[in-house]
């Protein structure tokens, strides 16, 4: 196992440059601010959203900025078959032996895809209680984290990683828009709405990559994990949700279309949300309204949505983008007397989304658009 650990941690043997990593300052800062807390930090989010890259960017900061000794940092990917017969405690013990580190010496542990480990929550509790370690862990499954995190109550925080926003997209594309070229903002922004914010897809533009990602989530993370007998039904459900992204999703209507029971439709919808393929937005109101009223459905990534529905209804795509920008403000939608307002944030800010043809001349001014897109 020693050889495997050295392969995952090249900074143990040489000065590592981390040259291939593209910076993501905003989500990285959200992760960094927990660096000196005692909490275990969980990174969650859609498959291939960049959780591994963010863990490695933090490792880079620890070595280059915080001056942490490289041997005090250990990264492992727990979906590696070669590590499948070892539990986390055994791996960490082996790591400490390699570098002659006692349990009292502080180390930084980066445990990628932690949910591949059976009883991971008990092992993390043991590490938390008995060793001096700062622990960062990642998972692409909200359902696994929700069912097992009670063991870690009071010991952990969860940070959801979202796709690249417009400014990050421009960085990944190596595009800088000067004031003189601000008229190009619209063009690049519409390209962004088509492409979405999955880092690897932004860099490569390979449609098969997106299709493979969706199939992996549907058939591995949902069908196989939940032992669903009709895989095609889940693919049909996915396509239906993509068509209805940005709209209020009536469970009864969905159930009728798919010819399944409403309870089954509701349960399957929650499975999609737990894999971060879709986000659900509740209606504003008293608790009974929030629970019982149908939810609005938004795609987790604009590129995935465009792939399966085409580049049409740009206003709806823009609304989806705005939702992703304000998701951290826990928005709900307002529906009163037949009228709807797109979002009411936790800070009591009402947001009605409009795009171009719906906007006034002043709102269409490029400087206004740039401020909005910088968000």
Which ranges hold each PLM region?
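A cross-kingdom feature that marks ATP-driven nucleic-acid transaction machinery
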Residues: 1-20, 53, 60, 64-68, ...
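Interdomain motor-coupling "hinge/lid" segment immediately C-terminal to the ATP-binding subdomain
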Residues: 2-9, 15, 140-142, 146-243, ...
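Pre-Walker A adenine-sensing motif
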Residues: 18-36
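Hydrophobic anchor at the beta1->P-loop junction of P-loop NTPases
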Residues: 43
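P-loop (Walker A) phosphate-binding loop of NTP-binding proteins
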Residues: 46
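Conserved glycine(s) of the Walker
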Residues: 50
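Short glycine-rich substrate-engagement loop in P-loop NTPases that contacts/grips substrate
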Residues: 74-104
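Sensor-1/coupling segment of RecA-like P-loop NTPase cores
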Residues: 128-150, 272
